Each structure stands twice: as C-alpha cells, then as structure tokens.
Amino acid sequence: MDCYRKYAAVTLTILSVFLHLLHTFPDGEFLMQGCPECKLGENRFFSKPGAPIYQCTGCCFSRAYPTPMRSKKTMLVPKNITSEATCCVAKAFTKITLKDNVKIENHTDCHCSTCYYHKS
C-alpha cells in the first residue's frame, strides 16, 4: 500500500510541475520551437483600449552561400562562407503622435528585409 502512495505522490508532483510550466509561458510560447514567423504583434506598452499599436515581431531566416573568389581576395581574414541576414521590418506604417508629442510608428504590414542595425 505504501508503495502505491509513493507512486501516486511522485505522479502528482510531476503533473503539478508540468502544469506550472505550461501556465508560466502564455500564448503557447513553451510549445513553440525556435522563433515565430515575422508578423504584426500588438505593442502592449503603447496600446490603449480601442486604439491598438502594432509592431513587427518575429524572425526571418538568414541565407549563407560560398564566398566568391574576387571577394575573398579583398578580405583581411578570408572566409569560405558569406551570410546575409534579414530582419523583420515594417513594410508599411502610419505615424502617430501620442501624449507629450511622442511620435511613434504604427506598423501596418511586415516583411523580411536587409538588417540595418546589428548587435555587436
């Protein structure tokens, strides 16, 4: 009998931990592998009820290809592979002025395009 109680306690503990993890990550973020696709997402910081503000969020895939020989000759440290990164950016937007003359862009369409700002 004591053996069954231990198994039941362990099973309930594992189930509680699993349910806790499931509720910790809202909107299915826990189940999502990698990064979501590039799309519009509501910016909860600037949005007001009835006046949502959207921004582009998500990931775009980078591509890699062999470095052309003429480019390799000009490199200080020659690389065999060249990569080209793309970022999720606004394809179209409208400018909005909030309180205190704060101007922001409300994105209306997103796409993957060349990254202009890179982290160092």
Swiss-Prot record:
<dbReference type="GO" id="GO:0006590">
    <property type="term" value="P:thyroid hormone generation"/>
</dbReference>
<keyword id="KW-0372">Hormone</keyword>
<feature type="disulfide bond">
    <location>
        <begin position="87"/>
        <end position="115"/>
    </location>
</feature>
<dbReference type="GO" id="GO:0016913">
    <property type="term" value="F:follicle-stimulating hormone activity"/>
</dbReference>
<dbReference type="GO" id="GO:0046621">
    <property type="term" value="P:negative regulation of organ growth"/>
</dbReference>
<dbReference type="GO" id="GO:0007186">
    <property type="term" value="P:G protein-coupled receptor signaling pathway"/>
</dbReference>
<comment type="similarity">
    <text>Belongs to the glycoprotein hormones subunit alpha family.</text>
</comment>
<dbReference type="GO" id="GO:0005615">
    <property type="term" value="C:extracellular space"/>
</dbReference>
<keyword id="KW-1015">Disulfide bond</keyword>
<keyword id="KW-0964">Secreted</keyword>
<keyword id="KW-0732">Signal</keyword>
<feature type="glycosylation site" description="N-linked (GlcNAc...) asparagine">
    <location>
        <position position="80"/>
    </location>
</feature>
<feature type="disulfide bond">
    <location>
        <begin position="60"/>
        <end position="112"/>
    </location>
</feature>
<dbReference type="Pfam" id="PF00236">
    <property type="entry name" value="Hormone_6"/>
</dbReference>
<protein>
    <recommendedName>
        <fullName>Glycoprotein hormones alpha chain</fullName>
    </recommendedName>
</protein>
<dbReference type="GO" id="GO:0008406">
    <property type="term" value="P:gonad development"/>
</dbReference>
<dbReference type="GO" id="GO:0016914">
    <property type="term" value="C:follicle-stimulating hormone complex"/>
</dbReference>
<dbReference type="GO" id="GO:0046884">
    <property type="term" value="P:follicle-stimulating hormone secretion"/>
</dbReference>
<dbReference type="GO" id="GO:0030878">
    <property type="term" value="P:thyroid gland development"/>
</dbReference>
<dbReference type="GO" id="GO:0032870">
    <property type="term" value="P:cellular response to hormone stimulus"/>
</dbReference>
<dbReference type="GO" id="GO:0010469">
    <property type="term" value="P:regulation of signaling receptor activity"/>
</dbReference>
<dbReference type="InterPro" id="IPR029034">
    <property type="entry name" value="Cystine-knot_cytokine"/>
</dbReference>
<feature type="signal peptide">
    <location>
        <begin position="1"/>
        <end position="24"/>
    </location>
</feature>
<feature type="disulfide bond">
    <location>
        <begin position="35"/>
        <end position="59"/>
    </location>
</feature>
<comment type="subunit">
    <text>Heterodimer. Glycoprotein hormones are heterodimers composed of a common alpha chain described here and a unique beta chain which confers their biological specificity to the different hormones.</text>
</comment>
<feature type="glycosylation site" description="N-linked (GlcNAc...) asparagine">
    <location>
        <position position="106"/>
    </location>
</feature>
<dbReference type="InterPro" id="IPR000476">
    <property type="entry name" value="Glyco_hormone"/>
</dbReference>
<dbReference type="GO" id="GO:0035265">
    <property type="term" value="P:organ growth"/>
</dbReference>
<comment type="function">
    <text>Shared alpha chain of heterodimeric glycoprotein hormones. These hormones bind specific receptors on target cells that in turn activate downstream signaling pathways.</text>
</comment>
<feature type="disulfide bond">
    <location>
        <begin position="38"/>
        <end position="88"/>
    </location>
</feature>
<keyword id="KW-0325">Glycoprotein</keyword>
<feature type="disulfide bond">
    <location>
        <begin position="56"/>
        <end position="110"/>
    </location>
</feature>
<dbReference type="GO" id="GO:0032275">
    <property type="term" value="P:luteinizing hormone secretion"/>
</dbReference>
<dbReference type="GO" id="GO:0010893">
    <property type="term" value="P:positive regulation of steroid biosynthetic process"/>
</dbReference>
